[in-house]
Amino acid sequence: IETIIGDVHIPSSNTTPESYLVQKYFAQMVEAGCQICVMEVSSQGLMMHRTAGIPFEIGIFTNLAPDHIGPNEHASFEEYAACKGMLFRQCRHGIANVDDEHFDMVLAGHTCDLETIGFSDRADYRASDMELIGRPGYLGVKYHVSGKIDMDVEIDVPGRFSVYNSLVAIAVCEHFKVSQEDLKAALKVVKTKGRIEMIKVSDDFI
């Protein structure tokens, strides 16, 4: 867990730092010339008002499950979902996974504009024709997205969850008018530390 400002990496003990640190880091980002900040806002961070007063441009919901929280983090799963939902009364625009079984619970009472992603016909950004790609030393997934955009996508991180994550990225990039060419190129090479990182042993093993 860390805060990254340009080439500077600042370790953090919390997913969402304390409010005074959030504001301190925002100030440092402005001084460094940052124009956009991406942050993970945890349910506890929202519950403890660490992001209070911040008018987020976009809020994102991908999924929710009981095993996402520890025994001392929330009094109940319902409280957890309600805290997650606070983000969508604090942002101008929401992007949410309509396939998730807790979609309605989390988005209840939202005050933002809302777009949806998923495999469902209800989704504004709909994934279809998902196919696992396997080559010597390589695993990925490809699919087609339709609705508010029409394009084929390939990601070198396999799994259905990767489709959901990339759909969110596509919706966000559409908001900022990123070209399809740049979007496709970025999705093809994006990596997340510790998430299905490939270790090549030989062409026969991964």
Predicted stretch roles:
Residues V30-V38, E57-F205:
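Acidic, Mg2+-coordinating active-site environments of NTP-dependent enzymes
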Residues I10-P11, A52-I54, M198:
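Short low-complexity, flexible loop/linker segments enriched in glycine and/or proline
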Residues S13-S19, I54, H74-E78:
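Short, conserved loop/turn and helix-capping segments at secondary-structure boundaries
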Residues F26-A27, M48, G85:
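Short hydrophobic/charged patches on amphipathic alpha-helices used for structural packing
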Residues I1-I4:
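Short beta-strand-centered segment that lines the nucleotide-binding/catalytic pocket of NTP-utilizing
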Residues H9-S42:
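Conserved nucleotide-sensing/catalytic segment adjacent to the nucleotide-binding pocket
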Residues G6-S12, T62-N63:
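Short glycine/proline- and charge-enriched loop/turn segments
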Residues G45-A52:
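Conserved helix/coil segment N-terminal to the catalytic DExD/H
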